[in-house]
């Protein structure tokens, strides 16, 4: 809803700015809007496929923070900020600020005030915070019943219904034909497919990888009516992680059963990994749960020697 006023508008000017030290944007007003993403996103992809804007931006410029501001003429100005916080691209648009404020007012009643606590003094510049509701409301807890996606269903999708040779050893079943190979582990219910025809051609170009994997996964029904969303990207290997969401919130699992990991090649899937467990029935629970206070969570994180906050960019 918030991006709707920005769609299909013209970009009047583009400016690329780099800072070797802390990033400063002197033109910012005090009432800007901030969008944070959990992953790096190519600016050209976001402008073209999300906002439907045409703009000549730096090649392969990725960002994970978008600042929405306005200039003296009341035009919306976008600042796409790089993950390392040294670069930003400034785009001045033809969208008027009052149109954006109207959209903001429409959703504000559904928004919940949050407060933040910095987790570690050494990470202030990287804006590593814990966010929690200022006035927490009661939320439901859920228990889920899982069932298993059939291996045959995944094979039909990834092998394109071609003839498959099957072999089994020590709880691992291997399926292959002349273009690909897949392994299924009975114990952890993990499925791993590799496209042999793309063996030398994995892509790390996010401008191609993100649209390709998104269209593939949604197009073939691999989500099976579950809510999976792009959650993280690896710019070196090109691997994308799609995470299962429930009621708008991300789910987490130590064994990775809540994720699909996929890498794109020149013409299609290069590598595809996922658990074949899926949520079947969600059970409401009326049990009361006592959650720890925000400060105790912050303290536990800051004093946990197993967490290296130099490598943490989003909480």
Language-model features, listed with the residues they occupy:
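Short, non-transmembrane alpha-helical segments in secretory-pathway proteins
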Residues: 10, 145-154, 198-236, 282-314
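Exposed beta-strand-loop-beta-strand "reactive/processing" segments of non-cytosolic proteins
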Residues: 13, 35, 146-187, 224-276, ...
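A short, polar/proline- and glycine-enriched secondary-structure boundary/capping micro-motif
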Residues: 89, 252-253, 279-287
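Zymogen propeptides/activation segments of proteases
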Residues: 55-56, 62-90, 210, 214, ...
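Preferential activation on post-signal-peptide N-terminal prodomains/segments
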Residues: 1-205
């Amino acid at each position: 809803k918030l991006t709707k006023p920005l769609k299909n508008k013209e970009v009047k000017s583009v400016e690329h700015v780099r800072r070797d030290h802390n990033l400063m944007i002197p033109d910012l007003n005090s009432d800007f809007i901030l969008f944070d993403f959990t992953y790096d996103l190519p600016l050209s992809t976001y402008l073209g496929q999300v906002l439907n804007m045409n703009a000549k931006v730096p090649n392969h410029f990725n960002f994970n923070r978008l600042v929405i501001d306005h200039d003296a003429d009341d035009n919306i100005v976008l600042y796409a900020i790089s993950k390392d916080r040294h670069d930003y691209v400034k785009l001045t648009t033809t969208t008027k600020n009052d149109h954006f404020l109207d959209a903001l007012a429409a959703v504000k009643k559904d928004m919940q005030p949050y407060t933040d606590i910095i987790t570690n003094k050494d990470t202030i510049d990287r804006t590593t915070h814990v966010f929690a509701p200022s006035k927490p409301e009661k939320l439901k807890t859920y228990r889920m019943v899982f069932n298993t996606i059939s291996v045959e269903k995944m094979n039909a999708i990834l092998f394109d219904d071609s003839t498959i040779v099957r072999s089994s050893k020590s709880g691992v079943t291997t399926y292959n034909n002349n273009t690909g190979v897949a392994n299924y582990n009975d114990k952890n219910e993990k499925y791993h497919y590799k496209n042999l025809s793309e063996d030398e051609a994995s892509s790390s170009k996010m401008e191609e990888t993100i649209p390709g994997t998104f269209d593939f996964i949604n197009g073939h029904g691999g989500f099976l009516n579950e809510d999976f969303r792009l959650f993280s990207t690896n710019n070196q290997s090109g691997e994308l992680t799609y995470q299962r969401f429930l009621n708008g919130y991300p789910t987490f699992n130590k064994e990775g059963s809540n994720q699909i990991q996929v890498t794109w090649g020149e013409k299609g899937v290069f590598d595809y990994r996922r658990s074949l467990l899926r949520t079947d029935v969600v059970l409401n629970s009326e049990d009361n749960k006592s959650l720890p206070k925000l400060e105790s969570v912050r303290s536990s994180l800051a004093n946990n020697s197993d967490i290296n906050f130099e490598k943490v960019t989003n909480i």
